[in-house]
């Protein structure tokens, strides 16, 4: 397939248009530009300030808060409220019927983990427009699952989607890997890719890797994913490995707990917006802490408290079993029951 990408100003939406010339299928990615001066009180100067701050389209403005817009020089609270309200009207944000929501969920696609058992408890695989958390002790398989997801994104057989949107997803999909612990290994990506008959270097070329040494860098990289999308990259997978390690080392003690949780909440909100607006899969890995007072139930719990608990769509706890076997327990989901699955981690990657 030959792909043409046309750029018209700022990148907002990717509308695939298909045509056939001499039996070749062409996908024209038409990009529609939002004119910010359509918003009340926004002239060319204010529009430029909004773009410089990253608010390049109506949807991003519609999902912003008044406080965020007032950080831009020259925008008052009253003006920010007016701008946001107008953007929401243009984006048709508001109440929808249950049937409309059900129809919209047809755009959701799923990415296989590599294990049929694990896919089954997830309802078919890693779901787009969602944040999936994998928590567990060291060596439980969190980073391996993240690496495998990057490889599987380049394997059409491991993507489950309606025909109407599958071509969009398969149009040179790319992954973003935010590495906070220095555990990303390109050699492992190559090894997993070759096990599936893929070109390891080609898979690596479709992964954007960023090493975050503190929470500010981590949050900035997540926010900058939109810049990659605006540059024309078809980002369909975002990974943060791991979510809470930088926050734990920077905010020590109960005195800084509230500040840490607020910041972590903002980070999770960014990841949720990416998943929802751009229809991508978001994976976060998470560390655990011991529960010395636990008489019943698990002796470890995921870091992040209620902030992460409420923000993550699917929560899975991983633990070691015998040899190369691992056990995954789905313990939180909006629509799936609690369930366990066993999978293996070998040289070939994740499988049953």
UniProtKB/Swiss-Prot annotation:
The residues that hold ATP are 136-143
**Keywords linked to the UniProt accession:** ATP-binding, DNA damage, DNA recombination, DNA-binding, Nucleotide-binding
Q: Which Pfam families match?
A: HHH_5 (PF14520), Rad51 (PF08423)
In Gene Ontology terms, what is one molecular function of this protein? ATP hydrolysis activity
User: Does the record bear DNA-binding in its keywords?
Assistant: yes
**GO annotation terms (biological process):** DNA recombination; DNA repair
What InterPro entries does the database record attribute to this sequence?
A: AAA+_ATPase, DNA_recomb/repair_Rad51_C, DNA_recomb/repair_RadA, DNA_recomb/repair_RecA-like, DNA_repair_Rad51/TF_NusA_a-hlx, Hlx-hairpin-Hlx_DNA-bd_motif, P-loop_NTPase, RecA_ATP-bd
The record's similarity note reads: Belongs to the eukaryotic RecA-like protein family.
| NCBIfam families, sorted | PRK04301.1, recomb_radA
Q: What does this protein do?
A: Involved in DNA repair and in homologous recombination. Binds and assemble on single-stranded DNA to form a nucleoprotein filament. Hydrolyzes ATP in a ssDNA-dependent manner and promotes DNA strand exchange between homologous DNA molecules.
Protein name, UniProt field: DNA repair and recombination protein RadA
**Organism (species):** Methanocaldococcus jannaschii (strain ATCC 43067 / DSM 2661 / JAL-1 / JCM 10045 / NBRC 100440) (Methanococcus jannaschii)
